């Protein structure tokens, strides 16, 4: 779950300019002094709270959105709102939850980390997704993200995960700013499985440009389970997020006994080329 937030921070400062001009981003810094959390992290925390407190997913997604509706990072240029117009309308009951947007994928990682059977992961992924993204495309995409996390937690390697989930995504160049699951899923899984550590997975994702904070949030959420995260990144992340985020994360990792800070050597057994 820290991986999702670190990914969000990594892509946060690039997203606005990418809406005007898609271009690759090459950097050695994952988190900079200007990095900030966005709706990706906020809604990830909404899902996590639902699990920790046994609360309704839809209720907390709407609650968190309304609570952070006026949130704006200390960074310019930026969007008028931290949430998409369509999601705000859904939150206020002005729009049905039939989106196929990549927001379904970016917030879902706690489900993959907090449940211990494949059935529970699938069931809760469906519940957490369908309220706002009730399309086959969005539900399928978020399910792939959570199952990738779940299988990595269980010790499957990259090749085994790709074969089990029938993942064969190719590298692609973004011609426009990506917002749908279909536009996003290829570059996320390509970046994840083409890397051999967390930082490289994020860097590969940034090189594709586009919806950088969401893309990196999705990849980071899965890369954490596959590769672990260096302790320095966790410490740096904690400087950029509110105390209530840190408290929920601490509680979640304590309950699950997950060790986010680890370095797992991964063989270069990629299927994706």
Give a label for each model feature.
Residues 1-273:
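Structured, active/binding-site neighborhoods that engage oxygen-rich ligands
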């Amino acid at each position: 779950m820290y991986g999702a937030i670190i990914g969000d921070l990594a892509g946060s400062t690039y997203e606005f300019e990418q809406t005007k001009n898609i271009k690759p981003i090459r950097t050695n810094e994952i988190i900079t002094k200007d990095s900030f959390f966005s709706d990706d992290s906020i809604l990830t925390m909404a899902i996590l709270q639902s699990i920790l407190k046994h609360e309704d997913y839809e209720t907390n997604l709407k609650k968190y959105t309304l609570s952070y509706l006026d949130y704006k990072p200390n960074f310019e240029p930026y969007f008028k709102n931290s949430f998409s117009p369509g999601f705000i309308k859904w939150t206020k009951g002005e729009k049905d939850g039939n989106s196929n947007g990549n927001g379904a994928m970016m917030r879902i990682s706690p489900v993959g980390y907090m449940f211990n059977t494949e059935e529970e992961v699938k069931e809760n992924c469906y519940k957490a997704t369908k309220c706002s993204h009730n399309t086959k495309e969005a539900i399928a995409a978020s399910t792939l993200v959570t199952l990738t996390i779940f299988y990595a937690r269980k010790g499957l390697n990259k090749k085994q995960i790709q074969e089990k989930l029938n993942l064969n995504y190719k590298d692609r160049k973004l011609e426009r700013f990506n917002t749908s699951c279909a536009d996003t899923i290829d570059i996320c899984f390509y970046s994840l499985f083409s890397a051999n550590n967390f930082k490289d997975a994020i860097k590969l994702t940034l090189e594709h440009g586009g919806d950088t904070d969401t893309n990196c949030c999705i990849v980071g959420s899965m890369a954490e389970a596959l590769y672990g995260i260096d302790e320095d990144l966790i410490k740096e992340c904690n400087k950029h997020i509110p105390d209530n985020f840190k408290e929920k994360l601490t509680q979640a990792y304590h309950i699950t006994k997950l060790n986010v800070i680890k370095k797992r050597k991964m063989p270069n057994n990629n299927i994706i080329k």
